[in-house]
Amino acid sequence: MGELGTMGGTRDFLPDEMIRREYVIDTLKTIFRKYGFEPLETPAIERWETLAGKYGEEGEKLIYHVVSSGSLGTLKAGERTEHALRYDLTVPLARVVGMYGDQMVADPADPKKQTRRLPRPFKRYQIQPVWRGDRPGEGRYREFHQCDADVVGSTSPLVETELIALTVEAFKALGFADFTVKINHRQLLKGLIEQAGIAPTKEATVLTSIDKLDKLPPEKVRLELAGKGLNADQLDALFQVIALEGTSEQVLEGARSLLAGSEAAQRGIGELTKLLHYLEALGVDSAYYRIDLALARGLDYYTGTIFETVSAAKVGSVGAGGRYDRLIYDLSGGKADLPACGTSFGLDRILAAMDQLGLFASLRRAGEVLVLHFGDPGVSQVCFELVRGLREAGVRAELGYHEEPFTPNGMRQQLGYANEKGFAYAVIVGPDEMAQGQAALRDLTTRRQEKIPLATAGQLIAGRLRS
């Protein structure tokens, strides 16, 4: 048998890591549901025809193909398989909307009536792994989770408003204090490029360079753009707008004046102005979002508002999203022509940021209380009753697995386990405690121990944990 290990670019998540991951995922799910999003799950394996042509030539090379055992010996070199592992969650969403978007079912409230199986707008969240045959490296994996929330079927800027509000609430719930949702608009950027006299064919490559301004100084980005054929006047026109500073309203007012000759830019500015008004009306704290005209989001399928969340931690973007009104049509093969807008949370980067910022310090492992168990007559039954009562009170309680009569060594072994697992309290009921009608309650953080009445031990411990 060879050395034990995992495939490159994949990971095991041991209990201490899983507790953190589940904490983040559960927090996101709670926020998603609070905003009316419903869960969706799709198969890991998709038909190749569903994925083909959706990710460009380079992206397609990274798709994992699935070979059935019956065709192992019949596939020729370069021949495609019929199935592949999903590459992202957006294409499966488009397939689902194309398959079920117009499907009618009986209305649960009135079986005589028909209603759409997928409400319109369709608000879904999806948290599942995806696979890419990338070269493994720092922060780059072949298997990783995406956490997406999308709204399909509405052009209203209220969609962007709620997604940004949701994003702010989610990061605050996770304990982040210093983070910013940067906001821009693809039509504003299109108008900027247009008014600067840059050919439309260069739009994608120019935006790719502009998007590096959060990592590189402006001079380096200017040099890169000059290398792509932009002259001094074009560069000045770009950076005059990109460099605008002040409040979000002041930045938009400056852009409105500088880009007065562009219909596309004015349309984008108008939508962003409305978005700011809605965010304020919804009570979203403006300390957590701002207009940033250097935000470009390299993906060319965005058509309207775009946004990206950055934190004080040095991990890069921890979330991003935007409006993509043509993508569902393209990805569904023309079966569904619906506007859409969504956001995605970077689970691995969020975990890295929270670890860096010490936001997991108060997060304990699965157990809260360990009831030490001893096999003395009568003691064992009391331990059973105590652990059952704690669980009924909603406390995460474990029973020690020591079956011998009370000994100091047996107590040390069980307390060692409690410390390893990070319990808050240990409850000790030995023959002496039994005789006194008491239990010894040990605080495993402070190491202090006290005697409490055995009859009310469960309620007392539950109360302390919930206070």
From Swiss-Prot:
UniProt KW keywords: Aminoacyl-tRNA synthetase, ATP-binding, Cytoplasm, Ligase, Nucleotide-binding, Protein biosynthesis
GO biological process terms on file: histidyl-tRNA aminoacylation
EC number of the protein: 6.1.1.21
UniProt cross-references to InterPro entries, sorted A to Z: aa-tRNA-synth_II, aa-tRNA-synth_II/BPL/LPL, Anticodon-bd, Anticodon-bd_dom_sf, His-tRNA-ligase, HisRS-like_core, HisRS/HisZ
Record's subunit section: Homodimer.
PANTHER family: HISTIDINE--TRNA LIGASE (PTHR11476:SF7), HISTIDYL-TRNA SYNTHETASE (PTHR11476)
Family: Belongs to the class-II aminoacyl-tRNA synthetase family.
The protein's name in its UniProt record: Histidine--tRNA ligase
Gene label: hisS
